[in-house]
A protein has these predicted regions:
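A donor-sugar binding/catalytic signature common to diverse glycosyltransferases
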Residues: 180-202
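Core catalytic architecture of nucleotide-activated donor-dependent transferases building glycoconjugates
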Residues: 1-171
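Conserved blade-ending motifs and adjacent loop-strand segments that build the rim/top face
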Residues: 170-180
Length: 202
């Protein structure tokens, strides 16, 4: 998909892209999870066409941790020798996907990138945090089970001091907004100071 990016990036669908009032309203409902009080910009009525959103969520690191069906799906990706998908292979990105040829080393490599352990996740978070130096808040978007997520949060709090750690489970939606929860995650990740994604996840 990188071949089509120069044209796609100039297309009306991206040049004129804007978040819908539904998603803006969902953000406004949950903005305390993402913004520092001193950085908040007032948001008008969520149904207004003149709604403004913060362009940048300084100090916020967003992490996408996909679990659930991905445990089995990652094995399928290894079997098919799949790499990072779509735009996750931009040369500007620091992470590369270069699996070794040895089977067992390859299996470990896929697991680390596709379905990482808690320890691997925490190590990556700390690495990004140290490189930025200004990150103080963490938002985790995930479909992980509550017990696994609780264990990860406990380990994160033991590893370093955070001003706030929040997750997808902390979001509060109206019934209508709940159907578009992943779009809110995308909005927040787009504007965060830093984002750690899963390169093989769409």
């Amino acid at each position: 998909m990188l071949d089509i990016w120069p044209k796609l990036s100039q297309s009306p669908i991206l040049q004129r892209f804007a978040w819908s009032p539904l998603i803006v309203g969902a953000y406004d409902r949950n903005r305390d999870l993402f913004e520092l009080k001193t950085h908040r910009a007032p948001i008008p009525d969520a149904l207004s066409e003149n709604v403004t959103l913060p362009n940048y969520l300084g100090g916020l690191l967003v992490v996408h941790i996909r679990r659930g069906d991905f445990q089995g799906h990652c094995k399928y990706l290894q079997k098919q020798s799949c790499g990072y998908n779509a735009f996750n292979v931009f040369p500007e990105f620091s992470d590369r996907f270069e699996p070794p040829s040895d089977y067992w080393s390859r299996s470990t490599y896929y697991t680390d990138h596709c379905y990482p352990s808690s320890e691997r996740i925490i190590s990556k978070i700390e690495s990004v945090r140290q490189n930025h130096g200004t990150i103080r808040r963490l938002y985790i978007m995930t479909n992980a089970k509550g017990s696994w997520l609780a264990s990860l949060l406990a380990k994160l709090e033991q590893t370093a001091s955070w001003d706030a750690i929040t997750t997808s489970r902390d979001l509060n939606f109206t019934q209508e907004q709940g159907y578009a929860s992943q779009a809110l995650d995308a909005l927040v990740a787009q504007r965060a100071e830093a984002f750690i994604g899963n390169g093989v996840s769409y």
